[in-house]
């Protein structure tokens, strides 16, 4: 029995560990270090209809507990992803989750319909955290009704299950999650980055050319845990958790909060082997805690009658 196997809508995962979108590109650089087939899945970099060159530099800044980024969804565009990146990934025995983004509802729908037809794309990750709605400038990811309508329209055209990536930069993330579930989402991924800023003490100016950026890394982990804990008790669709994961112990904490799988982001920049290391470490950790299968950990922190976990002597 594979103690790490996880079944999610559209995804049969050999283990619940995957690199998060935006921290792994399309896998080419990491394939020089290890066989990508060891991963549970790969969340590829966000894809838009046309190529995007991203924001001006500098667009990355280190922080004491992680990093800020303002990349700006740089990507080669839909055609190149379909013609080059996804075919290259077919050599690996790993399901692909395609992260899609757009500036308009129409762009989201067009990209979703096209990329969901690729043979190795098993699910979509709907990135509603960055773009704005045409004719109004309302962020897709911060207004429940708008997020729900976008989810509904993408679901209508997608050939694979749709997971929606939630922004933590909202007043009520539970309300957002419920609206998206009611619109037909198959799952959630959370959390995306928090808006932050660093200022250069010598110049008095923001370090990032964009001014603000997305904070990720260990600093956001307690926020991610809290939000997953709340959302997982309010919805019935599965959650892929992310936000500051570095170790196998971090993975279990996310599972206890209510996640059914996890994505590792910023840690890939620190250690390119972090994902296979976590995968290798998980079985021994389960043994130490007397846990038979990783799925036993889902929601343990809040489920009625859940037994406490005690390390074996």
From Swiss-Prot:
Record-listed substrate binding positions: 45, 69-73, 127, 192-193
EC number: 1.3.1.14
Keyword RNA-binding belongs to the record: no
A Pfam family matched in the record: DHO_dh
Reactions this protein catalyses: (S)-dihydroorotate + NAD(+) = orotate + NADH + H(+)
Pathway(s) annotated for this protein in UniProt: Pyrimidine metabolism; UMP biosynthesis via de novo pathway; orotate from (S)-dihydroorotate (NAD(+) route): step 1/1
Gene Ontology CC, one term: cytoplasm
Residues annotated for FMN binding in this entry: 21, 45-46, 99, 127, 165, 191, 217, 243-244, 265-266
Cofactor: FMN
Disulfide bond residue pairs: none
CDD domains: DHOD_1B_like
Main location: cytoplasm
Catalytic residues in the record: 130
Keywords: Cytoplasm, Flavoprotein, FMN, NAD, Oxidoreductase, Pyrimidine biosynthesis
Subunit structure comment from the entry: Heterotetramer of 2 PyrK and 2 PyrD type B subunits.
Protein name per its UniProtKB record: Dihydroorotate dehydrogenase B (NAD(+)), catalytic subunit
Species of origin: Geobacillus kaustophilus (strain HTA426)
Lineage: Bacteria, Bacillati, Bacillota, Bacilli, Bacillales
Encoding gene, per UniProt annotation: pyrD
